[in-house]
C-alpha cells in the first residue's frame, strides 16, 4: 500500500471553503468585506462543517489586479483590516476547528513593493537582481513575448536603460527566482506567517516562477521542481500544512510531481482542464460553446484514476475567476435547487480535497448587469475591444453574462434585508437581485436546502473512508445524459449516479444498486427508482 493511504493526512478528508474577502461580509459599513466580517460569520461556517478557509489575497496591495499585486507580504491591506485582525481571525477560527489558508503570489510583486522601488534605481542596487532585467534600447524589446493580460511582457525603465519582464500587468514585475536571496526572503516570509498560525497556502500561478524569458519559457521551466522542493523543505515541511499550487499548465503526469505523497512539493494541485471545455476550440473563454459532456467525463476520469495512490486532486467547480456552476452547467431557473445539489453530489463523491466557493452552498447564480455595473477590468476591456471590433452588442453581453468574473464576486447573500445583509453601506459591487429568495437565512434550518445537502456531503468525508481512499471507476462512459462512477476500498463500495440534464431518463444501474443503501439524493422521495428525474443525483453505499 502506498504511503498516502496508510499515513492519512488531515487534509485528505478535509473540505476547504474559499472566501473572496471583498464580497463576504462588511463589518464597518464601507461597502467592502473585511477580516472582522469573516469573524462575524465563523458560526455559519462552523455549521457547514468545513475544515479550512482559503482567503483570496489580503496582503497589502495597490489593487491593480485584485490584490494579486502585493506591495508588502508582511502586512494586511487596510481595506481588509490589519495584521492584528488576521491574528484574531486565525485564533477565532481555531475554536471552530477551522484553519486559515493564505493566498500567496510568489511569481511577481507589485511595482510599489520596496524591493522594486529600490531595484529600478540603479543596476548596482542590491535589490536590482530581485527582478528580471534585460539591456536594450527604447522601442527595441528583448524579444516579442506577450503578457497574459495583453501587450508586451517587457517594460522600459529609461533611468537605467533596461527592460523588466512581467508576465502579467506592467504593475506586476516578475521576481527573479534564480537569485538565492529572493528565495530566502520568500521562505523567511512564509515562516513568519506560519509562526502566526496560518494553516496553509494557496500558491498563485506557481508553475511560472522558473521562467526563462530568453528561451521564451514561461510555465514549467527547467528548475521548477527544484525550487518547489527547496521551498517545501525550508518552509512547509516544518508544519502540518495544506498547500495547493495553481497550475494552468499541469497534466496528470506533472501533477504527480506537485502532489507526491512524500510531501516533497505540495499537498495538491489546482488543474483547470475541465474548466475550459465550454469554449470554442482554439479561442478564448468569451467564445461560447456547448459543454461536451462525454469529454467532461473523460477528463475527470483521467485525473481520478491517474493520481490514485501517487498524487492528490483538488475538486472544484467554482472560484473567484469563474462563473457560478449552477448557471454554467446546471439550470438556475426551474431546476436550480435540484441541479445545484446534483453538481455537489457528483463532485463530492470523488477522491481529492473539495473546495466550496462562497455562495456555492446556497446555489447563488450568475448576474445580468448593465455594462456600467460591472467592476472587473477584464469585463470592461473585452466589452470595449469587441464592440470596437464590430461584434454584435447582444453577443458580447451574453458572453459576459456567461463567463464574466464578477459573477463570482457579487456580495454573499446572507438574508433578505437590504444589500442581503452584506453591508450597511453602499456595496462596492451591486448585489444580485435574487437575494430575497436565495440567501443563507432561508436555508440554514431547512433540511431540504442546498446548504444542508453540502453540510451532509462535508460530513460524509469524515464518516466514510471510501471517499478518501477508494479507487475510482467510471461507469456508462458513453452515456450522453448520466455521469456515474463507483468508489471502492477493501470494506466499502460507493456508487454515484447523476442525470446531468433536464430530461427524465431510464436508470441503467438498477441491478448494481439493488443491495445498496441510499446515502443522499436530491429528490425527497424516489417514486420510481427505475428512472432518473431531471438533474436527479443519488449516492449509494454498502459496507
Regions found by a protein language model. Give the residues of each.
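Active-site and adjacent substrate-binding regions of carbohydrate-active enzymes
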Residues: 2-543
